[in-house]
């Protein structure tokens, strides 16, 4: 493979990294406090939740790629498959968590970072238990999580497409794509610095810095990947 043929996959990987980093900022993560229903979001770490959705999307994209190839239409189908797979995984995760919060713990889903849910227009503050920063997965957080999952699936699928275009075997491309996703998810996690409720959270404004960091890291990852196949 010559340098010219490697430029397009390099650009695709750089864009994919930026998309993945942005996607993580949409996902409602409450960390350890959420596991005790004292913080809004799903009770796990930012990287783990984002990576789980991304890996599911990556598997969906890989299965689709094996059937449709890497034509322009095929690439679109691969990215759609990645997005839908990620959305299903994260949607089910948030739903099961919600059922446990509501019927197990007995708390009302309420967001701490907004007075009124931007989607349902329901008031939030009256339902936040004193001493907590919200609990459960309110509608705005659920929708934000689905958006983040879709973006993460698209980013992971695009990275897989780029690696396949470099001539790597599906298995090798899949392993590298997993590592690639973790790199960008961790960068986003450091940028967030703890928990985040979704696109309505003030921490969401930090996203541009994370995207810039992931763009640089993804470009470096892409250059190394290209050098591997030259």
From Swiss-Prot:
Taxonomic lineage from the root: Archaea, Methanobacteriati, Methanobacteriota, Methanomada group, Methanococci
Family: Belongs to the MtrD family.
One GO cellular component term: plasma membrane
Enzyme Commission number, as recorded: 7.2.1.4
Disulfide bond annotation, renumbered to this chain: none
Protein name: Tetrahydromethanopterin S-methyltransferase subunit D
Position of the signal peptide: none
Presence of the UniProt keyword Translocase in the record: yes
Transport listed as a keyword: no
Catalysed reaction, written as an equation: 5-methyl-5,6,7,8-tetrahydromethanopterin + coenzyme M + 2 Na(+)(in) = 5,6,7,8-tetrahydromethanopterin + methyl-coenzyme M + 2 Na(+)(out)
Keyword annotations from UniProtKB, A to Z: Cell membrane, Membrane, Methanogenesis, Methyltransferase, One-carbon metabolism, Transferase, Translocase, Transmembrane, Transmembrane helix
Protein localization: Cell membrane
Species of the source: Methanocaldococcus jannaschii (strain ATCC 43067 / DSM 2661 / JAL-1 / JCM 10045 / NBRC 100440) (Methanococcus jannaschii)
Gene that this polypeptide is encoded by: mtrD
Single GO molecular function: tetrahydromethanopterin S-methyltransferase activity
Function: Part of a complex that catalyzes the formation of methyl-coenzyme M and tetrahydromethanopterin from coenzyme M and methyl-tetrahydromethanopterin. This is an energy-conserving, sodium-ion translocating step.
First-listed, main subcellular location of the protein, grouped into a coarse class: membrane
Transmembrane segments: 7-27, 60-80, 88-108, 142-162, 168-188, 210-230
A Pfam family of this chain: MtrD
GO biological process, one term: methanogenesis, from carbon dioxide
Record text on subunit structure and interactions: The complex is composed of 8 subunits; MtrA, MtrB, MtrC, MtrD, MtrE, MtrF, MtrG and MtrH.
Highest taxon of source: Archaea
InterPro entries: MeTrfase_D
Top EC class, one word: translocase
Pathway the protein acts in: One-carbon metabolism; methanogenesis from CO(2); methyl-coenzyme M from 5,10-methylene-5,6,7,8-tetrahydromethanopterin: step 2/2
Membrane topology: Multi-pass membrane protein
């Amino acid at each position: 493979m010559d340098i010219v043929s490697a430029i397009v996959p390099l650009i695709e990987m750089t864009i994919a990294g930026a998309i993945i980093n942005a996607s993580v900022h949409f996902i409602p993560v409450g960390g350890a406090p959420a596991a005790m229903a004292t913080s809004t979001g799903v009770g796990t770490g930012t990287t783990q939740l984002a990576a789980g959705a991304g890996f599911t999307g990556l598997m969906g994209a890989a299965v689709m790629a094996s059937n449709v190839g890497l034509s322009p239409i095929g690439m679109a189908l691969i990215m759609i498959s990645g997005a839908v797979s990620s959305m299903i995984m994260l949607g089910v995760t948030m739903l099961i968590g919600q059922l446990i919060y509501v019927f197990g713990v007995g708390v009302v889903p309420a967001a701490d970072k907004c007075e009124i849910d931007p989607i349902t227009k329901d008031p939030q503050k009256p339902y936040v238990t004193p001493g907590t920063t919200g609990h459960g997965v309110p509608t705005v957080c659920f929708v934000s999580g689905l958006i983040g999952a879709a973006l993460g699936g698209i980013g992971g699928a695009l990275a897989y497409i780029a690696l396949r275009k470099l001539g790597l075997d599906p298995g090798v491309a899949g392993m590298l794509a997993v590592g690639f996703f973790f790199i960008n998810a961790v960068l986003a996690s450091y940028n967030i610095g703890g928990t985040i409720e979704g696109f309505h959270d003030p921490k969401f404004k930090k996203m541009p810095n994370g995207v810039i960091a992931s763009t640089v890291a993804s470009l470096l990852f892409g250059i190394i990947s290209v050098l591997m196949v030259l």
